[in-house]
Design a protein with these regions (language model features):
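Positively charged n-region of N-terminal signal peptides that target proteins for export
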Residues: 1-4
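C-terminal motif of bacterial Sec signal peptides marking the signal peptidase cleavage site
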Residues: 12-15
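Buried hydrophobic residues that stabilize the cores of well-folded domains
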Residues: 19-291
Length: 291
């Protein structure tokens, strides 16, 4: 079984070309006990609360064993902490794993010999979904979703597909489905292109934007657990939609900061929007702790 590995080895510089390096990098499987992502969101108006968001992933023997999403909400002198833990239970021989949240929503994954999910049964209080995952050379290339009609309903099954494309182990594009509420916008399927930098992804971090792309957003924890295929070879430095126009442009840049051992300690996400007349920016800073 291929286990997740998210910590660093010492970097050894070889006399090879950039093309040779991008063709494949062997990354050892160091131990990890925790990954923590923290982001402070400052309010932009009176009566709106500041929020600190944290995601904590916990591991034992390189397997994900716990996950908690926490929000610390602050209004004036009042602070409230809201925690959303996830229970993780593996089946015999780790051939399956079930994620259960605090309200009883379950996601049961079937794992192959490499530890990658091949299918998932999602069940909430009022909805069931089915997912299948496809891989090419170990990389996740397709996620298929079926939303089952509610019991007693005459509605048809709703299907969505997310496709991912790679070049030399680096993600170069995703094609995501148009959701029902988007159908009137004329967008159809949405293609997003990605640019890889020179920093090798030693810690095997997923791209944040990809993790939030529907329907992969339903499997964020599995993505960070290494259950959805090989990690990209290099850290992503930029993403942008394939379709833009003279009246709309968008580009997001990802800038990582590292410690002396090349361990990522923060990620700055900067998105630039243009409407043909002016440019606006949305900036985020995410702190990263890896133990």
């Amino acid at each position: 079984m291929k286990k997740i590995a998210l910590l660093l080895c010492a970097i050894v510089m070889f006399g090879c070309s950039d093309d040779e390096e991008k063709a494949g990098t062997e990354v050892p499987d160091p131990e990890i006990s925790k990954m923590l992502f923290s982001e402070f969101c400052k309010s932009d108006g009176i009566g709106v609360s500041d929020v600190t968001k944290e995601e904590e992933f916990r591991y034992e023997d390189a397997w994900l064993t716990g996950y908690t999403y926490t929000q610390e909400v602050s209004i004036a002198d009042l602070t409230e902490i809201i925690s959303h833990p996830l229970t993780i239970q593996y089946g015999n021989n780790r051939s399956s794993v079930t994620f259960t949240d605090e309200i009883g929503t379950e996601r049961k994954y079937t794992l192959n010999e490499e530890g990658y999910a091949t299918q998932c049964e999602y069940a909430s209080l009022d909805q069931k979904r089915q997912y299948t995952f496809s891989y090419t050379d170990g990389y996740l290339t397709q996620v298929n979703e079926k939303i089952m009609p509610r019991e007693g309903s005459s509605d048809a099954v709703v299907a969505h597909t997310l496709s991912l494309q790679y070049d030399k182990g680096d993600l170069i594009s995703t094609i995501s489905p148009s959701l029902p509420y988007e159908s009137s916008t004329g967008y159809g399927k949405l293609q997003t292109n990605y640019e890889a930098g020179e920093d090798i992804n030693y810690y095997r971090l997923p791209c944040m934007l990809v993790a939030d792309t529907y329907p992969l957003s339903f499997h964020r924890e599995a993505f960070f657990a290494g259950m959805l295929g090989k990690p990209r070879q290099h850290l992503t430095t930029a993403s942008y939609p394939e379709k833009t126009s003279d009246t709309y442009t968008e580009r997001t840049e990802y800038t990582y900061s590292f410690d002396k051992n090349k361990k990522p300690v923060s990620l700055k996400v900067s998105t630039k929007y243009g409407n043909g007349k002016s440019i606006s920016y949305l900036n985020r800073t995410i702190s990263i702790t890896i133990e």
